[in-house]
């Protein structure tokens, strides 16, 4: 089907565009951008007056739990949640059951996503076999089967020597390494950020040094091997300082943060709220301010949700034993738009961090509205006001710390390959 998107504020940092334009889509690709374009016979029309039109948003860090953990989420429900949140593409982490450390699992994900998914799914393979940190996975096979990056996300690669070899091998393969930066010996039995709140609640803490030390190690290894490195879910002031300094030295390091790290602090854990339990943990107000500053100055390249669904039975337990992680696909856009309202980011800068930069980091042919590009488009209603309600969420799991929050901003239309896969009705 052909489509004309009329009269929206088109923001495409890849072309330096920020103006009211029409977009004509033909055969799943961008045919033309211009003013006063006419709809061809039989074309659908999207009235985007008063709305913002951007390259399709990309979440480069999600857990779809498929295969093996479909009671939490699966490719169908996960991509439905992505579409509802305005995402046209997601990159799914390998901590499935079995772990995505081989061609067969990757091929399953690619095939199921193509057959049943609403949005593009780009698999991330495991750095090590079984994500056990003992031996490297076959990165060449993973890339050939469709993986766009490798990560042991959920666990760090403990061995520095193995991480060095991973960076060297991945560089040769032309595939990005995504680091889960965490020193487990410093984490110990910690379950939340170490500080005043953990002491008050009587919970064992995770020091900021656990993230900072691991970030420093991986940055130095990237510098030593002259290899690209992406650091996931950055949450501390110290890690951001390390990354900022590394970038200034010319190290090929990029990083992401998640909306919860610029929207919540460890105060959210009060009341032993297991929906505020994730890894890395929510940090202090000083860390939150540092995350916003790093978004503003470009130290942080991308915003990614770390969407981590869990069954109610895995969260409705004592805080110490509750699993880490929260869902985020459907709340990311309004929480991120708040950064624009607060003056932390301009709208074009936000689009860069949610579309253009993730595409560039992962090396995927998305994140642009250039003529001839795949017509992955997000149409945003910045004025939409809505309340986060468990029953209205598309995700199979409901483990969100934002339940009951009033949000401003939503995806009016999510368009994948020229097809409207979500419209806000």
Curated annotation (Swiss-Prot):
E.C. no:
3.5.2.3
Q: Where is the active site?
A: 306
Q: Which domain of life is it from?
A: Bacteria
Residues involved in substrate binding: 63-65, 95, 279, 310
According to UniProt, this protein's pathway is: Pyrimidine metabolism; UMP biosynthesis via de novo pathway; (S)-dihydroorotate from bicarbonate: step 3/3
CC per GO annotation: cytoplasm
Comment on bound cofactor: Binds 2 Zn(2+) ions per subunit.
Q: Which residues bind Zn(2+) 1?
A: 61, 63, 153, 306
Q: NCBIfam families of this UniProt entry? A: pyrC_multi (TIGR00857)
Name of the protein: Dihydroorotase
Q: Whose protein is this, by species?
A: Geobacter sulfurreducens (strain ATCC 51573 / DSM 12127 / PCA)
């Amino acid at each position: 089907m052909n489509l004309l998107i009329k009269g929206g504020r088109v923001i495409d940092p890849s072309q330096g565009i920020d103006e009211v334009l029409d977009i004509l889509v033909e055969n799943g690709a961008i045919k033309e951008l211009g003013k006063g374009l006419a709809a061809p016979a039989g074309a659908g029309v999207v009235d985007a007056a008063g709305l913002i039109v951007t390259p399709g948003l990309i979440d480069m860090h999600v857990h779809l739990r498929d295969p093996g953990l479909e009671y939490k989420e699966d490719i169908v429900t996960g991509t439905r949640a992505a579409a509802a949140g305005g995402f046209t593409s997601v990159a799914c982490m390998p901590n499935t059951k079995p772990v995505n450390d081989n061609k067969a699992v990757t091929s399953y994900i690619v095939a199921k996503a193509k057959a049943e998914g609403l949005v593009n799914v780009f698999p991330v393979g495991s750095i090590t076999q079984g994500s056990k940190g003992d031996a490297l996975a076959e990165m060449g096979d993973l890339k050939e089967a469709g993986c766009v990056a490798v990560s042991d996300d959920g666990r760090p690669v403990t061995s520095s020597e193995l991480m060095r070899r991973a960076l060297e091998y991945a560089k040769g393969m032309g595939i990005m390494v995504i680091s889960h930066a965490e020193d487990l010996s410093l984490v110990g039995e910690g379950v939340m950020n170490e500080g005043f709140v953990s002491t008050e609640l009587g919970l064992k803490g995770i020091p900021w040094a656990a993230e900072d030390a691991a970030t420093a190690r991986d940055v130095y290894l990237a510098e030593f091997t002259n290899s690209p490195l992406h650091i996931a879910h950055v949450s501390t002031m110290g890690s951001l300082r390390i990354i900022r300094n590394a970038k200034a030295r010319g190290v090929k390091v990029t990083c992401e943060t998640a909306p919860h790290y610029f929207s919540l602090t460890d105060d959210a854990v009060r009341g032993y709220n297991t929906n505020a339990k994730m890894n890395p943990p929510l940090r202090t107000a000083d860390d939150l301010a540092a995350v916003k500053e790093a978004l503003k100055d470009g130290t942080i390249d991308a915003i990614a949700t770390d969407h981590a669904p869990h069954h109610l039975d895995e969260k409705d337990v004592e805080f110490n034993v509750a699993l880490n992680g929260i869902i985020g696909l459907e709340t990311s856009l309004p929480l991120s738009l708040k950064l624009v309202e607060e003056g932390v980011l301009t709208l074009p800068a936000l689009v860069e961090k949610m579309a253009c930069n993730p595409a560039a980091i992962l090396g995927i042919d998305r994140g642009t509205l250039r003529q001839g590009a795949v017509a992955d488009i997000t149409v945003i209603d910045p004025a939409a006001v809505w309340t986060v309600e468990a029953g209205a969420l598309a995700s199979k799991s409901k483990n969100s710390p934002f339940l009951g929050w009033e949000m401003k901003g939503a995806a009016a239309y999510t368009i994948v390959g020229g097809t409207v896969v979500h419209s806000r009705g």
